[in-house]
Amino acid sequence: MILKISEIVFDYQGQVRAGWRILYYLLLTGAGSTAFIAAYKAAATSLFPAAAGSVRLGEIAPYALIGAAAILGAFIMLRFFDQRPLKTLGYSMHTRMGIEIAQGILLGFFMISILSGIEWAAGYVSFSRAEGDFGQLPLTFVYYAAVFTASAAMEESLTRGYAFQALVQGIGKAGAVCVSSIAFSLAHLFNPHVNGIALLNTILAGVWLSIAYLKTRSLWLPTSLHMTWNLSLGFIFGYPVSGAIMPDAMTRLSRRGPDWITGGAYGPEGGVLCTGILLAAILFLSRSARIKPAETACSLWHSPGQA
């Protein structure tokens, strides 16, 4: 059977098929990211020379700019292809927004605390206060919170935002979770000290965060989970985060356990203990009645023309 070009591009409802919309979205986001970062570098160099040399601003800016490009790309796609308002992307100000952020912060910190407690009780790690100016700790905390918030918002916009929602519409929830989670893992393929367990755990993290979105129809919960996981892991407890070390973490970590359990130089995300923590979190999110969407989020999702 030979398909017409119109059937390849459009579905039976006359809407551009999900695969094409995702491709357009990624092209828009890529072009926007390139333009925003180039403009930032040019402006910083010519107008704000001190900012151009700021290591800390240089770490936050790319995440924020790529995140902005991802949201702008979503706005264009939603407006001209999906006929949906931008607030259906997942960052709308709704009645459960504060609850979802609080749930993400508490659950993310609890998960890392349990992981750290098990490793400490098993004698695999020990913790001590890091050296340095203790008075700078609050400012350093705020800095890392900003970095990890920008990073989490960027990654969630890209992997649980418009592209994921189009996948849900095109191939269903299960297929969308699988595809996006594998893509999320492959994005970490070249991280320092990565291993097979780390890639598996990153797939599980993608499933975990996808469920957080699907249960709430909002990006507040997955973003706060993602941010708090990284902040707790790297800054508070002093572990490597996906192979990256926080040089001014508040805790000094000494590691002695086997790499296949602790993750070694990659951090806990490269060990089987993290696998168990993530599986438990997936089960909890899937079954918890406390994780639910706001009424406004439900109405937005189920309005005409939506997935």
Q: Can you describe what each PLM-predicted range is?
A:
Residues M1-L86, G90, G234-A307:
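N-terminal, membrane-interfacial amphipathic/helix-forming hydrophobic leader that caps
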Residues I2-S6, Y40-P62, R84-S157, F164-Q169, ...:
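Juxtamembrane helix-loop-helix connectors linking adjacent transmembrane helices
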Residues I22-L27, I60-A61, I101-L106, F141-V142, ...:
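Hydrophobic alpha-helical transmembrane segments
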Residues A64-A69, P138-A145, L158, L200-L204, ...:
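Membrane-embedded alpha-helical segments of multi-pass membrane proteins
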Residues I112-S113, F148-T149, G172-L189, T202-I203:
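Small-polar-interrupted transmembrane alpha-helices in polytopic inner-membrane proteins
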Residues A130, A187-G196:
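Membrane-interface helix caps and helix-loop-helix hairpins in membrane proteins
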Residues M154-V179, I211-S218:
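Membrane-interface helix/loop boundary segments of multi-pass membrane proteins
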Residues A183-F184, N201, L225-N230:
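Transmembrane alpha-helical core residues of multi-pass small-molecule transporters
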